[in-house]
Amino acid sequence: MKGFRAGIILLLIALAYAEEYTTFPYTIEAEDCEGVDKAWTSVYENVIKGEFSGKVKEDGMYQFNARVAQILNKEGRLQTISINGIDFQYTVPYYDTWIDFDFGMHRLNKGTNKITFKGIYGYAEYDTITITDATFPDFSKVPTTLSDPKATKEAQKLQEYLASVYGKKIISGQQEIYGSGNNGNYELEFDFIHDLTGKYPAIRGFDFMNYNPLYGWNDESTERCIDWVNKRGGIATASWHINVPKDFENYKVGDKVDWQQCTYATSSTFKTENAIVEGTKENEYWNLAIKMLAEQLKRLQDANVPLIFRPLHEAEGNANTDGSGAWFWWGKAGAKTYVKIWKYLYEKLTKEYDLHNLIWEQNLYAWSPDSIQWYAGDDYVDMVGYDKYNTVYNRHDGKTSGPNLDAETPIFYTLLKFVDNKKMIALAENDSIPGVNNLIVEHAAWLYFCPWYGEFILEERNNAKSDLKEIYNNEYCITLEDLPFLKEK
């Protein structure tokens, strides 16, 4: 078999000619593709083109694999698969021998479809491309037992409910604003949704950022969390944007610091790797921050409130394992240190503070196969969350504005493979809510969605009112009114 090298090259794969339906599995030798440069050279721009069509009977999902080699860059090289002009990028790791690379699961529409492989940021060698009918896991087999063997009955009951709807429906959610935003009106986003759709989201997102050793104050997030669960029958989730002083070198643990001199970004002089090293100032601060958080989580536990807890989120940031792409301080020392910090927090809260009302949700990305290195492990994680922000960047349709109804199905299934279908996968944060038709047709079984507050839910450039009405009033979407918890009390 001869290979070809896809540089910045347009390669359209011939699934079938004319009007006949394509038979799957379908494999094509790369060198047999019309218009391909047979020599091992790179081709720039869209100089070489070939247009071919394939025909399928109905909308559906298909698996794409290619036999590839990549010797350009040991850090990996981006390759793009384009389905009917919609681009999806994958980082192909360095391999100097042929390997079978998973280009993900993608949707083909009823009728003719065009498939393109192109190396926008470099090239790889291709030998064969294989397309097969997609197969889907049995979502009902996801484990329902929590990682914490002492989990409260409320947490276990919530986990069992989540597992019972996983893969069948999607649960609606909405993040509340934190601090004193919206002039103190924490109901703004929720009233907006209800006034528009007649429904309330089932999940309410909170953040414990303001319970911190620096400028901490009680914004009553804990009280609202208890009210949402115990009085309104909802589900609560919470993140934790824990701040550190920007000038940590000159900070004395216990001192108050103006919020403008604090950050959760990577710009602080706080040495992340020391957070778990006993005897360091960073560790002393980290322990104090955990103690203050634990006080609030204990109040929830005492009120019999289970919580989907999502701390230390978005750690990888942009694709990396060494912390070079991190957005937050907890990720800037790299994947290995981050996993240790996660486990440290888990052990502190469950063992030292005896907190067992938590369903632990860890944010992961799917930039490359290396993204799995950020995973803390099955014994420390109950659920995986993905944060989707792609109305401007990382779109597949070439647009740079407006709602993006893409279900991000390839990412869902990549994350599912990371955890071997042992954990539920959720859209922990998002801008546009995926289109309900896309979710159903593509089997993108996200457990829940949860738009961020403010413009992400209120403005049409992120979520069109018509789209919100459609999904909130579709039987596939679970709203507050559908939850069984209040009825059972």
Show where each model-derived region lies.
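Substrate-binding cleft of secreted/luminal carbohydrate-active enzymes
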Residues: 175, 423-489
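Substrate-binding cleft of extracellular glycoside hydrolase catalytic domains
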Residues: 214, 222-344, 351, 355
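Aromatic- and acid-rich polysaccharide-binding/catalytic face
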Residues: 371-400, 450-453
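Aromatic-lined carbohydrate-recognition surfaces of secreted/lumenal glycan-active proteins
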Residues: 174-175, 310-312, 342, 346-370, ...
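Active-site clefts of carbohydrate-active enzymes
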Residues: 388, 392, 396-397, 412-440
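N-terminal module-boundary/linker segments of secreted carbohydrate-active enzymes
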Residues: 132-206
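Alpha-helical scaffolding within the catalytic cores
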Residues: 184-193, 220-223, 295, 364-376, ...
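Extracytoplasmic
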Residues: 19-156
